[in-house]
Amino acid sequence: MARFDIVLLIGLCLIISVFPDTTTAQLSRGFYSKTCPNVEQIVRNAVQKKIKKTFVAVPATLRLFFHDCFVNGCDASVMIQSTPKNKAEKDHPDNISLAGDGFDVVIQAKKALDSNPSCRNKVSCADILTLATRDVVVAAGGPSYEVELGRFDGLVSTASSVEGNLPGPSDNVDKLNALFTKNKLTQEDMIALSAAHTLGFAHCGKVFKRIHKFNGINSVDPTLNKAYAIELQKACPKNVDPRIAINMDPVTPKTFDNTYFKNLQQGKGLFTSDQVLFTDGRSRPTVNAWASNSTAFNRAFVIAMTKLGRVGVKNSSNGNIRRDCGAFN
């Protein structure tokens, strides 16, 4: 499990603190120190219980956090269930594949918090998701880091708001940079956060074109490692159920590490949006650097996750603390 020494942790705190933002001024590491002082331990225990039941909870929670923050900010709006009068974010086609185990991590942590009288209805679902995301990263061997707290839960969740706001598996670096820039994230942040694909799985439907019908000249994307392409074709043959799952990282799918970048160097990025990070000269130097230096990657990932957690934060004037993470109060 990755560990940072004290000097590195202090350095990260200093780097992160130099980016004050009026929209995130309310965030602090001790936000619940008086109202729910054991919030982190309670959430961590709930996360660990869930992971013991299924490892899917790890990548599912990490992906859920990203999808939440990139659509109207980190406000747990992705948790909201649709109603006859409103189609919520989670039911947009780009979110349909979000695994239920990620949602359940938040639900179980919320139950654990509410069973503590001093914490009942004190901690936002947005903060629960943020804490749980850090905890699943650590559980998979990734870096531990301090989490800023104080988010309020969003009051709006619509499927239409998702459209065009999430990266796609065929995106190039220009498209990726544009999406991340919109959320005040740099190219380096984008590359670091893309490495979340070191965990979990994707569905055959997302890679079918790349391995069977790439274009009029090549049936297989020529940037794919040939042996890896054959493996993918065997796992996802023509006419296969598009819901069949395949590992994002063919080498260490259950470990958070920098193998993701080593895979890209070998042409083993599952999505086009992964492999372009190596084939594009603008991002290749960073991929090469982090492939050979896990400490540098971990440092960049912590910074990127902290910045991501500041996107679109709600306060008491445009948010609240939900009693049920899946429904508005």
Swiss-Prot record:
The record marks R63 as: Transition state stabilizer. Keywords: Calcium, Disulfide bond, Glycoprotein, Heme, Hydrogen peroxide, Iron, Metal-binding, Oxidoreductase, Peroxidase, Secreted, Signal. Gene3D superfamilies: 1.10.520.10, Peroxidase, domain 2. Belongs to the peroxidase family. Classical plant (class III) peroxidase subfamily. Residues 1-25 form the signal peptide. Substrate binds at P167. The lineage of its organism: Eukaryota, Viridiplantae, Streptophyta, Embryophyta, Tracheophyta. This is Peroxidase 35. Its cofactor is heme b; Ca(2+). GO terms for biological process: hydrogen peroxide catabolic process; response to oxidative stress. It comes from the Eukaryota. The active site is at H67 (proton acceptor). Disulfide bonds join C36-C119, C69-C74, C125-C325, C204-C236. Its EC number is 1.11.1.7. Ca(2+) 2 binds at T198, D249, T252, D257. It is found in: Secreted. The keyword Disulfide bond applies. It catalyses: 2 a phenolic donor + H2O2 = 2 a phenolic radical donor + 2 H2O. Its main location: secreted. Induction: Up-regulated transiently by a cold treatment. Glycans are attached at N293, N315. Slightly expressed in roots. There are 73 peroxidase genes in A.thaliana.
